[in-house]
Amino acid sequence: MAAVTSEFPSKPISYTSTNTSAKTYYLKSVKKRVTTCFQQLRDKLQSSGSFRKSSSSCLNQIFVRSDFSACGERFRKIFKSARKTELPELWKVPLVAHELTSRQSSQQLQVVARLFSSTQISTKEITYNSNSNTSENNMTIIESNYISVREEYPDIDSEVRAILLSHAQNGITISSIKSEYRKLTGNPFPLHDNVTDFLLTIPNVTAECSESGKRIFNLKASLKNGHLLDMVLNQKERTSDYSSGAPSLENIPRAPPRYWKNPFKRRALSQLNTSPRTVPKITDEKTKDIATRPVSLHQMANEAAESNWCYQDNWKHLNNFYQQASVNAPKMPVPINIYSPDAPEEPINLAPPGHQPSCRTQSQKTEPTENRHLGIFVHPFNGMNIMKRRHEMTPTPTILTSGTYNDSLLTINSDYDAYLLDFPLMGDDFMLYLARMELKCRFRRHERVLQSGLCVSGLTINGARNRLKRVQLPEGTQIIVNIGSVDIMRGKPLVQIEHDFRLLIKEMHNMRLVPILTNLAPLGNYCHDKVLCDKIYRFNKFIRSECCHLKVIDIHSCLINERGVVRFDCFQASPRQVTGSKEPYLFWNKIGRQRVLQVIETSLEY
């Protein structure tokens, strides 16, 4: 049980002693006068002759007929005299009562603000103590009511304290505690009623009432969490809707999530101070001047951010890369970026989805009108008679590649297929996002589910098997395979996942394809789920043991530190919804993608 101490007055509010004594005296006098009146009336009726002649059943008629007028006059005189004497006092009582009521309401408003902060947890019986000097009340909360909840959820106290510790600057409301608990554990909060009483039974938990009337919970410092509490309190202050400060932007309703196929025109221009009003349009006459003019590092970074809305969390890599690219890149006309708002908008006549021309069987065409149907990234330049298709060039250079344009004989013959150098990629949203952001591979048009080659959003192992049957690849093609995360997130049994993976490898061998396997990376938004993390560990162990005759790239180790803890600085800030699965994905940021690419490229060889 927990005792809540407040400062309500111990005795009931009463009027002054003079008013109370006067009221008691008037009541006694009225009672005495009425009693005397009835006694005189009874004596008078007994002395009359009509009372002796009548029976007892006619007492009411005799009483009313004989002396109604006299009795009414007596009552009228009694109440009239009492009204005259009490009238001056009745005018004073409501005024005094109003003053006391206003004083009481002001005291209650002050007490409510400190009601929850003065809470003390105890295991005693339910008691009520009052003291006229201190004016304190103790009400209790029965702690034994929540024993069953703690037996079913043994870690709920520590989890709630962790949530309160992370919001120690401004406190947190009950609704926010429930949402944070669901994000932390994946389960709904076990209580729906009396949540305040339950939270106050947790040691070192305090509560107070804000100006808006919301109950704000916080955590007191102790020997165990004192250093952590100081660290949180010394962080950069952030206000929230449930604190006394200004409202925060984190609780303002956001726009629905944008899928990758939607915002091809990136909105990085506003952050890079490159507004369409201030940037002049690029014309064909100026392309030669732009190609020969020395380009600054900041301008090159802005151009990269326009075509690739990357996260600016690895500026060191961007700095080194563009310095190297500016030295090694040949002098050639700069292509117009079709994603830039400055590019001229031309009508593009696309074929229907069912009659899309096949890039594998159709020969290259030099006419600009025919190239529009093939999704070409560049426009024809002055003095160039040969239009280079995108698949004739190596992808955007990563860590170990240069910035020059080289022809590749083994590159997949498609504008949309995801590949790294000459190696096709097969995987789910992690590989799809990696190919889009780092390798500049495009998505296949007119598809509801985002896909690029063998990379499909929400791709499972069985889905990869079915997709592999519809793809024609030359024998001996080495395919980088990263698959299995979706099956694990959907709760599929591990033995079934391993069986499907064996069938996938077997079918690739039957098609004379060479798989280059990668183990699964840690799932940043499921690190709290020990069962799922253990399943990932066992599946990676299975890949290493069963596929010992194949090349296996360990990308899991580059996303954890030496103690086995996940490097959350390699992940984005929050999960994102994808088109092919209902499970949210916490993608790698720029640092994480570059780490994975570096590990993969280091292990590749022809």
From Swiss-Prot:
Subcellular location: Endosome
Main location: other
Phosphoprotein listed as a keyword: yes
SUPFAM superfamilies recorded: SGNH hydrolase (SSF52266)
Top-level taxon: Eukaryota
Note, other: Capu, spir, and stau are required for the initial localization of osk to the posterior pole.
InterPro entries attached to this UniProt entry: LOTUS-like, OSK, OST-HTH/LOTUS_dom, SGNH_hydro_sf
Protein's gene: osk
Full protein name: Maternal effect protein oskar
Tissue: Begins to accumulate at the posterior pole of the oocyte from stage 8 onwards.
Region span, Leucine-zipper: 425-439
CDD domains for this protein: LOTUS_TDRD_OSKAR
Subunit structure, as described in the record: Interacts with smaug (smg).
An individual GO BP term: pole plasm mRNA localization
Domain HTH OST-type, residue spans: 152-221
Any Pfam family the entry gives: OST-HTH
Sites of Phosphoserine modification: 270, 275
Organism: Drosophila melanogaster
Keyword Heme attributed: no
UniProtKB keywords: Developmental protein, Endosome, Phosphoprotein
Physiological role: Organizes the germ plasm and directs localization of the posterior determinant nanos. Oskar protein is required to keep nanos (nos) RNA and staufen protein at the posterior pole.
